[in-house]
């Protein structure tokens, strides 16, 4: 588990290079006992903290709301995918948290990123949400604005990268990896995107090297230049459903 001292060091090496700090790269951030402190450290260093959670622990996350992260994304689609408990209680806890956090100024995004997959419960989820945030809702390009600082967002299901699966057969590829995101694992490993939770595309270690040095490495530059040409040069990228969904980048 990442210590406070280690987190401070990583933040110091990200400061000035990134704007948003997402507690997001696999795992459940609400499991970390120092998360409220981490949020404060990020803000002290001029970073904008954003959380992504599966929502199962929101009933005991009051201290997180009090820490005032910029945004919290709740992946409601994880319930149907993992069959965790009763839907009504799950949505109830999520909505109570959303109403509390949003009233403090935090943006809350309720995510249903399961279109084309396990989405049979979406209608029931929407009805439960409506009991906490009554209509009318304001339509947006990616979903709805439900209330002040509360949004419902949809997206298509995609296959996560898997080094063991076959490569996708696609004529062109694209990804925002190293364009507007990178990832740092708990051991300091820098990866190009938030989907590489195993560190298969290790670009360097932030505990050992400066971020500028890591991003200027031959491997990092080859990945970036490859996607500029709409080509996935890394084997893991060629096995990722996100880069192959080219329509995603033509909205």
Please report, for each region that a protein language model flagged, where it lies by residue.
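Conserved glycine-rich "GG(E/T)P / GGGxP" loop and the immediately following alpha-helix
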Residues: 1-141
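Short clusters of hydrophobic/aromatic residues that line enzyme substrate/ligand-binding pockets
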Residues: 2, 58, 175, 203-206
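Charged/polar, solvent-exposed surface patches and flexible loops
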Residues: 9, 96, 127, 131, ...
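Structural motif
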Residues: 18-20, 179, 201
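Short glycine-rich loop/turn motifs that provide flexible caps or phosphate-binding loops at active sites
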Residues: 26, 187, 203
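Short, solvent-exposed loop/turn segments at secondary-structure junctions
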Residues: 29, 56-58, 77-81, 113-118, ...
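A C-terminal junction/extension of Radical SAM enzymes
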Residues: 100-193, 231-246
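Flexible mid-to-C-terminal extensions adjoining Fe-S/redox cofactors in radical SAM and related proteins
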Residues: 190, 195-251
């Amino acid at each position: 588990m990442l210590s406070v001292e280690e987190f401070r060091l990583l933040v110091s090496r990200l400061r000035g290079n990134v704007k948003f700090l997402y507690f997001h790269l696999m795992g459940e951030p609400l499991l970390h006992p120092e998360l409220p402190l981490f949020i404060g450290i990020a803000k002290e260093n001029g970073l904008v903290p954003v959380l992504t959670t599966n929502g199962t622990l929101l009933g005991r996350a009051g201290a997180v709301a009090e820490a005032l992260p910029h945004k919290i994304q709740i992946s409601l689609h994880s319930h149907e995918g993992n069959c965790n408990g009763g839907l009504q209680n799950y949505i109830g806890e999520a909505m109570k948290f959303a109403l509390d956090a949003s009233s403090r100024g935090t943006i809350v995004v309720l995510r249903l990123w399961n279109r084309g997959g396990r989405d049979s419960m979406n209608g029931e989820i929407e009805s439960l949400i409506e009991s906490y945030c009554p209509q009318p809702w304001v339509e947006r390009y990616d979903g709805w604005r439900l209330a002040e600082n509360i949004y419902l967002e949809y997206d298509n299901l995609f296959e996560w990268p898997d080094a063991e699966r076959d490569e996708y057969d696609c004529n062109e590829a694209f990804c925002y990896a190293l364009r507007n995101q990178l990832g740092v694992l708990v051991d300091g490993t820098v990866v190009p995107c938030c989907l590489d939770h195993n560190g298969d595309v290790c670009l360097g270690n932030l505990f050992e090297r400066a971020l500028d040095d890591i991003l200027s490495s031959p491997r990092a530059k080859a990945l970036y230049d490859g996607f500029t040409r709409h080509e996935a040069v890394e084997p893991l990228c060629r096995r990722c459903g996100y880069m192959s969904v080219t329509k995603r980048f033509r909205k």
